[in-house]
Regions:
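Contiguous segments within soluble domain cores/interaction surfaces
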Residues: 12-101, 105, 124-130
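C-terminal motif of bacterial Sec signal peptides marking the signal peptidase cleavage site
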Residues: 7-10
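Sec-dependent signal peptide recognition
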Residues: 1-3
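Short, exposed beta-strand-loop hairpins at the edges of beta-sheets
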Residues: 108-123
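A short, hydrophobic secondary-structure junction motif
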Residues: 112, 130-132
Length: 132
């Protein structure tokens, strides 16, 4: 029973992202964060192995962006993201791999520094759906 309790505590997703900026938006939807950041997909209907873009609006002066995608439903390693600024929006073109699950949840982790060099981290979740 003790080992079962330890296992359940280790799987608690609430214990992982305490010091980060997250939001309660729905997967695949435009998300607004408390620090005036926004994240959204070029197309809310994501299919594996099909290109799409992730868009960001960040506070003025944001710099040193680093981002990656990781599978939540099934860990499949991580996919680095390269954001490029296009006007007021940061854009990363990417795609996700196919998984044995029909619906796969992905997590984008983004870190950046504010204009006064304060580090910030935000998370954005979305689902890909196997259509074949």
């Amino acid at each position: 029973m003790f080992l079962f309790s330890v296992f359940l505590a280790a799987c608690d997703s609430q214990s992982i992202e305490e010091d980060s900026t997250s939001t309660s938006c729905e997967n695949n939807r435009h998300c607004y964060y408390p620090n005036n950041a926004e994240a959204w997909l070029s197309n809310p209907d994501i299919s594996p192995e099909t290109p799409f873009a992730i868009n960001l609006k960040l506070p003025n002066g944001a710099k040193n962006l680093a981002a990656k995608l990781e599978g939540v439903t099934m860990y499949m390693g991580f996919i680095p993201l390269q954001f490029k600024r296009k006007g007021q929006v940061w854009v990363a073109d990417t795609m996700v791999g196919a998984c044995s699950e029909p619906v796969m949840t992905w997590k984008m982790t983004l870190t950046y520094n504010t204009v006064d060099n304060q580090p910030r981290t935000l998370f954005y979740y979305f689902d890909s759906i196997q259509t074949r």
